[in-house]
Amino acid sequence: MIQVLLVTICLAVFPYQGSSIILESGNVNDYEVVYPRKVTALPKGAVQLKYEDAMQYEFKVNGEPVVLHLEKNKGLFSEDYSETHYSPDGREITTYPPVEDHCYYHGRIQNDADSTASISACNGLKGHFKLQGEMYLIEPLKLSDSEAHAVYKYENVEKEDEASKMCGVTETNWESYEPIKKASQSNIPPEEEAFYQRYIELVVVADHRMYTKYDGDKTEISSIIYEIVNTLTQIFRPLHIRVALIGLEIWSSGELSKVTLSADDTLEAFGEWRKTVLMNRKRHDNAQLLTGMIFNETIEGRTYKSGMCNPKHSVGIVRDYRTRRHFVANRMAHELGHNLGIDHDRDSCTCGANSCIMSATVSNEPSSQFSDCSLNKYLNYIVRYQSTTRCLHNEPSETDIVSPPFCGNYFKEVGEDCDCGPPANCQNPCCDAATCKLTTGSQCAEGLCCDQCKFTKKGTACRPARGDWNDDTCTGQSADCPRNGLYG
């Protein structure tokens, strides 16, 4: 049994009201300095893990006590995760680093239903959390006292510049790619289709400008990408999409595709490189280029609308122009949203925040939420283009999840019948969130052949016909929808 470690942090808080300090996120005003004192409560004889599966931090923000609950993001890496860089003479070097005991967490604030947190615990606490609708950042201070941390509101980070920035996908060009083959009408109601789990196996590429920007420090670049993807996985959870990092590549010896001031040309070249090189080397669903290039026309990212699963068009490019990882994760989520058929938000779209993920202009305070319009667009996309987005159905096998099973992390792992998340978040009547077992009388909790907790009748169509092939049908013995030879 995995022991849950509860860590209580007692903090001495020293506010620096009106003062300014240069932190990793930039120049910050009005921050608080906190000194964590870690109290560990492990059962007698329990083994101390380097990075615990669950942690709890108690501290004060603006004089008020808060309790931060954290759980390790166990779906962050795939089993065959790899990292690739290049020697000075251009020779490819690929490694398979152990990632089981990583230090990246998701979390929430106790008694705040709308709270979120994305934290790295690798060297102190670093990341962001939302409390009472406001975004806070936390990071270790680079002082001789290694226990000192800074906590500050996102709004107190001085902006690099106030020029309006934008996504490169505009109304005049976002139809540049649409899947040619459209699925016939599904027998599955759209409201049910929205709740089926999908998966994006992601490769992130750091270009040579990123490599030189960070002085050739591959470890730092990798950590940056881990933080970005950790936030990315949290952003896509409401869409029932699990994002797993399957590969990371650093162009350490030079650019491997053309990177220019033109975002369009850069995207075109990167898509061609993905199709002809990367896909032959690494199985994945989507690739994102993180670049140090400053594009023309204040463009921060570019992609192909509805390009997901296409060999050349399931790509995006994102500029790494800020040290705030949450901001870059927001832009990458935005481009992935376009890949999934989502348009820019209109003025009438809402998400409960000042700005939403799919806003056409880049907000200085990024959102972590998709709007109501985005959710509807995504649902329309997956219903309309089922046959061309089948890569999203490639669920990792239970043995592909590299960490030990942990009930409540949304991943069905070895020994579990289901996993609908923590009890407070679970909305699946077929699954007991406390045990990750099926509820009494239930045969299944999810799947194309699961209806009201029971296996669908044998012969029921679960995936519509494609071309000359007949419908895929349920067996009556499983919640899975078996694929015919065309898609097997």
Swiss-Prot record:
Positions that bind Ca(2+) 1: E201, D285, C391, N394
Pfam families to which the protein is assigned, alphabetical: Disintegrin, Pep_M12B_propep, Reprolysin
Q: Which cofactor does it need?
A: Zn(2+)
Per the UniProt entry, the disulfide pairs are C309-C391, C349-C373, C351-C356, C407-C426, C418-C436, C420-C431, C430-C453, C444-C450, C449-C474, C462-C481
PROSITE patterns, A to Z: ADAM_MEPRO, DISINTEGRIN_1, DISINTEGRIN_2
Q: Where is this motif: Cell attachment site?
A: 466-468
| Top-level class of the enzyme under EC nomenclature | hydrolase
Give residue ranges for the propeptide: 21-191
- The active site lies at E335
GO MF, one term, reads:
metal ion binding
KW Metal-binding (keyword) present: yes
Keywords (A to Z) from UniProt? Calcium, Cell adhesion impairing toxin, Disulfide bond, Glycoprotein, Hemostasis impairing toxin, Hydrolase, Metal-binding, Metalloprotease, Platelet aggregation inhibiting toxin, Protease, Secreted, Signal, Toxin, Zinc, Zymogen
Query: What's an example GO BP annotation here?
Result: proteolysis
Q: Where does Ca(2+) 2 bind?
A: N409, E413, E416, D419
Give the Enzyme Commission number.
Answer: 3.4.24.-
Q: What is its main location?
A: secreted
Localization, per the record, is:
Secreted
Q: Which residues bind Zn(2+)?
A: H334, H338, H344
Does the UniProt entry include the keyword Calcium?
yes
Q: Where is the Peptidase M12B domain?
A: 198-396
Glycosylation sites noted in the Swiss-Prot or TrEMBL record:
N296
The Gene Ontology CC terms held by the record are: extracellular region; plasma membrane
Question: Could you describe the subunit structure of this protein?
Answer: Homodimer; disulfide-linked (disintegrin).
The similarity comment for this entry is: Belongs to the venom metalloproteinase (M12B) family. P-II subfamily. P-IIb sub-subfamily.
Quote the protein name from its UniProt record: Zinc metalloproteinase-disintegrin VMP-II
Instruction: Give the species this sequence originates from.
Output: Crotalus adamanteus
